[in-house]
């Protein structure tokens, strides 16, 4: 189902497109074409090697930062070791020329045929990145729809192994999904039905509280010392400062049912999904 969600949201952000091309089913097609080209044309293999070498040199020329996680008394020695290795590295500093690839942008639905008696369904709507004020309501909305409607409709009644909704701030997408699902069209109808359920039936405050607490607890979940350091480093590199996290946490705690209905109308009703 991760592949299905990736396909549906493939063109909703630059990162989503990159992930689809590099790690998704799109990459599988690329690898198939590459192998075929190499088998039919000897120069194709050398062209691949040349391209990989150019990418490697481009990485070596790029600005670098090193993250070192260790015990305090070892830090000075290990920093010296890292510096010694990189200072001795000889790098060709001539300009790096890489093949430019024209992006293929399409919002068409896709279906991939597999040898199985079950389906993996996904439906994606364009959304906002995580710093946007609507990101918090969309995060809560995903859990709210999953707990309040989708789990029952898709798993308990529909017979799928699982299903739900998720908001992805990197892909800038709000996605519905199911996995190992004996149904197809009926599941997509359930995705739509969850929207109608939220907008047109009475909602209970305790369900909202459960969705919010689930998100906040996942944010506050402790990790290992090394894991915490690594996470903090990459978060800072991408502007996810402690102040940013506090702001997001406060926004999550302040989400109301009216907020859920507002973002549902704006992002799910007034936009067409990609399936």
Which residue stretches match the model-derived regions?
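A short, acidic, amphipathic alpha-helical segment used as a generic capping/interface helix at domain edges
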Residues: 47-53, 255-267
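Glycine-rich phosphate/diphosphate-binding loops that line cofactor/substrate pockets in enzymes
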Residues: 54-61
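An aromatic/glycine/proline-enriched structural segment found at the starts
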Residues: 65-122, 127-129
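Glycine-rich, charged/polar anion/phosphate-binding loops
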Residues: 50-53, 105-110, 126, 160-162, ...
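M16 family metallopeptidases and their MPP-like homologs
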Residues: 1-43, 61-71, 119-140, 150-255, ...
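Well-ordered, non-membrane alpha-helical segments in soluble/globular domains
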Residues: 45-49, 76-79
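Aromatic-residue-lined binding/catalytic grooves and analogous aromatic/hydrophobic interfacial grooves
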Residues: 41-46, 55
